């Protein structure tokens, strides 16, 4: 007999006997086993303690409501859009140029062609808040204080808040401030003036007011060639007429043809014309009769 099978049969017999004892209630309990004590591995000497990762701090927000990470780009885009609007408006007699050092500062000049301030050339600077367009309205300060009811006689600042008490984004624009600065020289307003003397003279003694306006225009014209108050490569400056420089530039401006006119002349229109040259009446050409 195979010893393996003999061992298996004996073990079966022993197992059956143990089961019978269990059924009869004679149960022997085995002593509890003592589990070995668990120990953590030792920590290396140069190891850093493991700390819980901190949650990322919320992105800081700038005063204009945009995230600080892209706030400067948003401001730059807004100012670029504003300057594009100024160019498209083509404000008569008003020229502006953003500063080289800061997009929040624009240099400008206003030419007055008729009215009480005729022949006036007034240079100014526009200061834009750093939280534009959610802050206050831009400030406009003339380089030389102009004698005007709405211009501070000391600082030269124009009362812009009169027209823009609360600056509304997407509704108010910088070109409107420039248009307002031009309009105040053609339509005089004396209510709540920054220069009370100018307001009183305009209401009580218009001749004396005109005399002081003429003097103010002469002062601005005499100091037109002064160096800009703010040192900046893009600051607007004037120089006396130089024929070797300005004659050529003037000739180019006067002889420059519009692109539309050049395009119309280059396009050849084929077909018959029934309009006599120099006439706008159709069928004005005289028909030539052939003698038979």
Swiss-Prot record:
Q: Which stretches are tagged as biased composition: Basic and acidic residues? A: 14-23
What are the UniProt keywords, alphabetically? Apoptosis, Cell membrane, Cytoplasm, Membrane, Phosphoprotein, Protein transport, Transport
Coiled-coil segments: none
PROSITE patterns given in the database record: UBC_2
- Which Cys pairs are S-S linked? none
Q: Where is the composition biased (Polar residues)?
A: 1-11
Membrane topology per record: Peripheral membrane protein
Domain UBC core residues, every copy: 74-222
Q: Please list every transmembrane segment annotated in the UniProt record, as residue ranges.
A: none
Q: Which InterPro entries match?
A: Ub_conjugating_enzyme (IPR050113), UBQ-conjugat_E2_core (IPR000608), UBQ-conjugating_enzyme/RWD (IPR016135)
Mind naming one GO cellular-component term on file for this protein?
nucleus
Modified residue Phosphoserine is at which positions? 30
Q: Name one GO biological process term.
A: endosome organization
Query: What Gene3D superfamilies does its record include?
Result: Ubiquitin Conjugating Enzyme
Compartments where found: Cytoplasm; Cell membrane
According to the record, the residues making up region (Disordered) are 1-63
Gene Ontology MF annotations: ubiquitin conjugating enzyme activity
Q: How does it assemble?
A: Component of the FTS/Hook/FHIP complex (FHF complex), composed of AKTIP/FTS, FHIP1B, and one or more members of the Hook family of proteins HOOK1, HOOK2, and HOOK3. Interacts directly with HOOK1, HOOK2 and HOOK3. The FHF complex associates with the homotypic vesicular sorting complex (the HOPS complex). Also interacts with AKT1. May interact with FHIP1A.
What role is this protein assigned?
Answer: Component of the FTS/Hook/FHIP complex (FHF complex). The FHF complex may function to promote vesicle trafficking and/or fusion via the homotypic vesicular protein sorting complex (the HOPS complex). Regulates apoptosis by enhancing phosphorylation and activation of AKT1. Increases release of TNFSF6 via the AKT1/GSK3B/NFATC1 signaling cascade. FHF complex promotes the distribution of AP-4 complex to the perinuclear area of the cell.
Per the record, the similarity remark reads: Belongs to the ubiquitin-conjugating enzyme family. FTS subfamily.
PANTHER family from the xrefs?
A: UBIQUITIN-CONJUGATING ENZYME E2
This chain's protein is named AKT-interacting protein
Q: Which organism is it from?
A: Homo sapiens (Human)
Task: Please name the gene that encodes this protein.
Answer: AKTIP
